[in-house]
Every structure is written in C-alpha cells, then in structure tokens.
Amino acid sequence: SAFNLNKKLIYLESGLRTNNVKDPFPEEGYRQMVSRIADINFCPTSYSASNLYSEQTKGKIHVVGNTVLDNIKKDRSDTSYGNTCLITLHRNENLNILDLWLNEIERFASNHPEIEFIFPAHPNPIILKACENLKKIKVVKPLQHRNLIDILKKCKFVITDSGGIQEEGCFLNKKIIVCRKTTERPEGIPTGHIVMCEDP
C-alpha cells in the first residue's frame, strides 16, 4: 500500500531470510519484496542486516534489536527449568502433517511421564481436529503473550514452528526443537539453542 501511494516505508524486523522464496510461503517472498522497496530497514540482529547488505538493499539499514525481547527484559521474574515442554505448531507447511508431528510428540511424552507437555492450540479447525485424541499432551486455548512467556520461562525445552518463539526461547536460554526445513532466525543454531527437525 505504501508503495502504491508513493509513501515512505519503514520496515521493522527487516532482513530475516531463509533464502528460499517459497519456504515459508508466502512470508519469505513478502519479506524479500518489502525490504527492496523500504526506505528504512530496522533489523533485529547484525546477521539480518548482513543479509540486506549482501542483497545490496538500497534503503537505509539499522540494527535496532527486538522490541519483543525488550519487553521480556522489563519482566524481572526468574527463569527456571521445570519439567514442562511448551509446544506451538501452527504454520501452513505443517498443517498437512500435523497429525504426524503430534503422534511423534505423543509417543515421546508416553516415554517421559515426568514431563508435562503443554500445547496452546491455534483455533484453526485442522489443528483442533488433530488434537482430538491426544492423551499425553495437555491441549489448552491460545494464551495471552505474557502467560505464554511465563510458561516459556519455566519450561525444560520447546517444540515449535514459530519464529517468535525461537527468538524468545534463545533469549531465555532454552533448548528449542524447530519443526521446519528452514529458519529465518538461524542465530540460535551455532549457540546450540536451536535444533532443526525437518520431518516428523
């Protein structure tokens, strides 16, 4: 819309890349297109800024950090390591195989009764259908962000396909299993926080 109206465009969270324009679809394509027309690009990390420099992006590039993480910093409650696993799965590319993911997690949960597996389920009918017969995974309604962060702070590890959870989990020093083929937030891989898991 800004481009069509010939308005200045500031792109927050710019520079995130999987470098596969169709994965995730359509987000990656939009990200690449918007950064090319943005007048100012605000990047969360130096890595995301380096993506824009390598693409010879014409707009101004600034590394400004992450406002979500800034908000978490304000909450000074302790981060602990309890016996909880937080699950978030909602991406389009996983919907067709969501039952496979959940079956594998359910099997793992059966072998680890000491861990409570919590899944705040997106209200998508496909997701709710896949949750109907789960016995070892506690399915709950979507949570407010603060409540989600409270669980994240106390959990032992995370299973997710969410980009935001990857950022927040790394910041809180959690182990994260990412149920995707690619990630636009790879900074947590070399630190050992993120483990990519392509298939159920």
Residue spans of the language-model regions?
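Nucleotide-activated sugar donor-binding and catalytic core shared by glycosyltransferases
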Residues: 1-119, 124-200
